[in-house]
Structures are given as C-alpha cells and as structure tokens.
From Swiss-Prot:
Pfam families: HALZ (PF02183), Homeodomain (PF00046). GO terms for biological process: lateral root development; lateral root formation; response to gibberellin; root system development. GO terms for molecular function: DNA-binding transcription factor activity; DNA-binding transcription factor activity, RNA polymerase II-specific; transcription cis-regulatory region binding. Residues 128-163 are annotated as: Leucine-zipper. Residues 68-127 bind DNA. It is found in: Nucleus. Keywords: DNA-binding, Homeobox, Nucleus, Transcription, Transcription regulation. This is Homeobox-leucine zipper protein ATHB-23.
Length: 255
C-alpha cells in the first residue's frame, strides 16, 4: 500500500505542527501531577524512606554481636581465655550464665551467645575430623588384612590343586606296592617245607622206610596243595576291583 500527496489533502497543513506543540505542552502537566502526588518531598527522600521500612523492624547484628554500623569489638586474650575455660565446663549456655559472663567480661549477652555458638560449631568440626581420621585408619588396616587373606587363600588353592593332581599317581604306586607284597608273601610260603628229619636221613645215607615214604608222599601232596592255593591267592592279589568267576582246579590229589 503506497501513500501519495493526494491523501494529505484531507488534513489541514498545520495538523502535524499542532500535534507536536500539544505533546510538548502535555509533558509539563504530567510532571506537575507526579510531583503533586509525591508531595513536597523529593523523589530521593521517598526512596530512602521506602528502604528504611525494613530497618525499623528488627535490628541487625554482626557476627560479634555488635549492631550493624557500629564498630566491631574484638575480644582480648583475657576474655578469650575466660570464655574457653567456661566452655570447657559446659558448652550449653543458659540465660543466667550468659548474663553473668557478660557482666564479668564487660561484653554484651548477644556477643557471649554468638561466641558459644561459633565455638560449638568448631568443636563439632574438629570431632568430625577426628572421627574421619580414625575411620580412615581402620579402613586402611582392614584393607591390608584383606589383601593378606586373599594371598593366603590363593596359596591354599594352589596346594589343593597340587594334592588333587598327585592322588592318581599315589593310588597307582599303592597298587604296585600291594602287588609286590602279595608276591613276596607267596614266595615265602612256597619255600621248601620238607621236614628236617627226612633231610637228615638222606644225608646220613639210610634208606627210607615204608613209613617214611608214605609220610614223604603225604608231605609232597600237601606241598602241591599249598602251591596251588598260593597261585590262587596271587591271582586274587593281582586284580583290583574286578568281579568275575574263577573256576577252581580239579583236586585230583584227593582222589
């Protein structure tokens, strides 16, 4: 949409100038009304009065108990020593005790209360630091003990594995030893069991009698029976955990 000079023909030539002068005349009127609303006091006075509304309620104090704006009073060494000594007797401050300390030390009761409050906070902080150091030492000692126990556990596990690996070899050696003992026992039993009387008769050159021959035959048959029994016992000693049927030899000597 475009504007041209033909549109201005509807308005008088002094229209814009009149509006400009009217705006300039209206501004002083507004300022006068604003000053009338505030009254005779200046705007700075009103701002200061607004800021002082909260200050009239509660009085503010600094950390040492003095009012804001007043010069801070620092405690001397005697006052500090007296307060420390009294704090050691009891960290709880009652109203009567607070007033007595304030009169004795020449301080305000609020200063005494704030000092006790700060001193309790410092004592709690120191106690927490001590507890932390103690717990830290306990943790470190337990950690070292845990490492030692883990090392011992690993060694024991290695010993158990070594013993498990040795068990099959030891069982084989035991089987061999049992077999050897059984064979040695059978050899000892199957030795010469001929009676000494017969040996002495042959050594002297006397011919054996009929009774002697019968005894010798009986002894030889008994010897064969012992050998057969020993052979059977050797067969049983050589077998480990095997079940089966073993046929007995025909006992022809009894027929």
């Amino acid at each position: 949409m475009s504007c041209n000079n033909n549109g201005l023909a509807f308005f008088p030539e002094n229209f814009s100038l009149q509006n400009h002068h009217q705006e300039e005349e209206d501004h002083p009127q507004l300022l006068q009304d604003f000053h009338g609303f505030l009254g005779k006091r200046s705007p700075m006075n009103n701002v200061q009065g607004f800021c002082n509304l909260d200050m009239n309620g509660d009085e503010e104090y600094s950390d040492d108990g003095s009012k804001m704006g007043e010069k801070k009073r620092r405690l001397n060494m005697e006052q500090l020593k007296a307060l420390e000594k009294d704090f050691e007797l009891g960290n709880k401050l009652e109203s009567d005790r607070k007033l007595e300390l304030a009169r004795a030390l020449g301080l305000q009761p609020r200063q005494i209360a704030i000092w006790f409050q700060n001193r309790r906070a410092r004592s709690k902080t120191k106690q927490l630091e001590k507890d932390y150091d103690m717990l830290k030492r306990q943790f470190e000692s337990l950690r070292d003990e845990n490492e030692v126990l883990q090392t011992q556990n690993q060694k024991l596990q290695a010993q158990v594995m070594a013993l498990k690996s040795r068990e099959p070899i030891e069982s084989i050696n035991l089987n061999k030893e049992t077999e050897g003992s059984c064979s040695d026992r059978s050899e000892n039993i199957s030795g010469d069991i001929r009676p000494p009387e017969i040996d002495s008769q042959f050594a002297l050159g006397h011919p054996p009698t009929t009774t002697t021959m019968q005894f010798f035959q009986n002894s030889s048959s008994e010897q064969r029976m012992v050998k057969e029994e020993n052979s059977i016992s050797n067969m049983f000693c050589g077998i480990d955990d095997q079940s089966g049927f073993w046929p007995w030899l025909d006992q022809q000597q009894y027929n």
